Regions:
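Extended hydrophobic packing segments that form well-structured cores
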Residues: 99-141
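A structural signal for small-residue-enriched, beta-sheet-centric alpha/beta enzyme cores
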Residues: 1-96, 122-124
Length: 141
């Protein structure tokens, strides 16, 4: 039976994916803002800033991977928020790269715990506009 339920997960990404697997969820459409996705793309599953914070480093590394200008990478590293940092990004494909990495990290997290869960990801700007998504996010819409 197909269900289309939405759940707010706060900072406990790993815990919520574990619970989804326990309830035998087959597919999750993971939607959220850039700051959370940057951390998950880096393999961080408890995203509260008191526990973990490497957003700018992860964002800068991925910006380099897509060929972002070095001067912009330095500005990203000096930014206070991912919203500010995103203003320095010219190579917008970095957002799709982050979405794809977050998808892979979530699926790997579940596989390590013995579950097979399909995840698709969508990244929103602070203004709630779509800025990135995994390759197959829109396939079933």
């Amino acid at each position: 039976e197909k269900s289309e339920e939405g759940v707010v997960i706060s900072n406990f990404v790993g815990y919520m994916f574990d619970k989804a697997c326990e309830f035998e969820v087959k597919k999750i459409y993971f939607i959220g803002e850039l700051g959370k996705f940057v951390k998950v793309a880096g393999g961080i599953f408890h995203t509260h800033s008191r526990v973990s914070d490497a957003k700018m480093e992860i964002l800068a590394a991925n910006a380099l991977l897509v060929g972002e200008k070095l001067e912009n990478v330095y500005k990203i590293l000096e930014s206070n928020t991912t919203e500010e940092a995103s203003g320095y990004i010219e190579k917008k494909e970095v957002f799709n790269l982050l979405a794809e990495k977050a998808k892979q990290k979530c699926e790997e997290h579940c596989r390590k715990n013995g579950w097979n869960l399909e995840v698709e990801t969508l990244i929103l700007s602070a203004e709630k506009e779509v800025i990135g998504h995994s390759k197959h996010f829109f396939d079933n819409f």
